[in-house]
Amino acid sequence: KAKCADIDQPCKTSCDCCETKGACTCYKSGCVCRMGSFXATCKK
């Protein structure tokens, strides 16, 4: 799994801090994963 990036950028694979394989967006503070209506936020 890809790690959350240090700079804002979309993740091509799920972040290792997220349980879902949904779309993941990396932010400096962590990452946000979405799968349908489910959303999970997580920090590095």
Curated annotation (Swiss-Prot):
GO MF annotation, one: toxin activity
Record's subcellular location: Secreted
Keyword set, alphabetical order: Disulfide bond, Knottin, Neurotoxin, Secreted, Toxin
Coiled coil: none
Tissue: Expressed by the venom gland.
Keyword presence, Metal-binding: no
InterPro entries from the UniProt entry: CNTX
Domain notes: The presence of a 'disulfide through disulfide knot' structurally defines this protein as a knottin.
Family statement drawn from the similarity comment of this UniProt entry: Belongs to the neurotoxin 03 (Tx2) family. 06 subfamily.
Primary role: Neurotoxin. Causes spastic paralysis and death in mice within 10 minutes at dose levels of 3 ug per mouse.
Name of the featured protein: U4-ctenitoxin-Pk1a
